[in-house]
Regions:
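Short, hinge-like loop/turn segments at secondary-structure boundaries
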Residues: 63-64, 115-117
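N-terminal Rossmann-like NAD(P)+-binding domain of SDR-like oxidoreductases, especially those catalyzing
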Residues: 1-104, 124, 147, 153, ...
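Intrinsically disordered, low-complexity segments enriched in polar/charged residues with Gly/Pro
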Residues: 46, 106-107, 205-207
Length: 255
């Protein structure tokens, strides 16, 4: 969507984030670096994405020290928003934390996303579109694990601000669960072959389509800092999380 219609992403992620930051500053502060007493422990939590780092080669993982190198209008808008958050901390003293997560999956995800699309099209006996050669790699994070990570980071930031009035930090949230898109499609089809068998395998519906513009080859998050500093660890591996996800979408799409 950001490739066909980037306007809404620019307005929401850049201008929208600036509106929130500016409102927070005007509400919380008397002047730069001087907070109102009732907002001493307030801070801004920016939830971002691993896409801001750009595309990786075959080796290595994104750490919090990686430079931003976004390659699509969406990732550029998120990178711009992150930079605005950073600027409000350094310019005005607004406490802030940024978390950059890997690909989320699980119940209630938007229908256009990869995993819901594979399941929905498989169940509807439609083509299952896979961009390019299907070998684009993503690090996958179950949505509930992401929620727990966000809560843990929030609590950590709140306690740190009690100790020190100035606070800014960045955390990557990932699971070291790297999967090619084609492998995900095959896993889902195999699952459906077992629980909802039909005359032919669902894998026969997989269709390779023209790659989309700006399609980064590989993302991979290094969550070491989050694990070391806060003690967070994902509770779902990709297999267990995907099983729960498929079961949820079968109920949604089949009733």
């Amino acid at each position: 969507n950001s490739i066909k219609n980037p306007d809404i992403f620019i307005k929401t992620n850049i201008y929208g984030t600036w509106n929130l930051l500016n409102s927070a500053y005007k509400t919380w502060f008397l002047e730069p670096f001087l907070k109102k007493d009732e907002f001493k422990q307030s801070f801004f939590y920016q939830i971002s994405t691993d896409e801001v780092y750009g595309s990786l080669g075959e080796n290595g993982k994104f750490t919090e020290d990686n430079a931003y190198a976004p390659n699509s209008p969406y990732s550029a808008s998120k990178a711009s928003a992150d930079m605005l958050v950073r600027s409000y901390h350094h310019t005005y003293g607004l406490n802030a934390v940024i978390s950059n997560c890997s690909n989320n999956y699980g119940p209630f995800q938007h229908d256009e996303k990869l995993i819901p699309t594979i399941i929905r099209n498989a169940l509807n006996n439609a083509q299952i579109p896979i961009y390019g050669d299907g070998k684009n790699i993503r690090d996958w994070l179950y949505v509930k694990d992401h929620c727990v990570a966000i809560e843990s980071i929030y609590k950590y930031a709140f306690e740190k601000i009690k100790e020190n009035n100035s606070f800014f930090d960045v955390f990557n949230i990932g699971t070291n669960e790297e999967w090619q898109n084609i492998d995900i499609a095959n896993k889902i089809c195999s699952y459906l072959d077992n629980v909802l068998p039909k005359n032919t395998s669902y894998k026969e519906q997989i269709t390779f389509v023209k790659d989309r513009a700006g399609h980064d080859r590989r993302y991979a998050i290094d969550p070491t800092k989050l694990q070391r500093v806060i003690g967070w660890k994902a509770q779902e591996n990709f297999n267990s999380g995907l099983d729960k996800t498929i079961q949820w979408y079968i109920k949604k799409y089949k009733g």
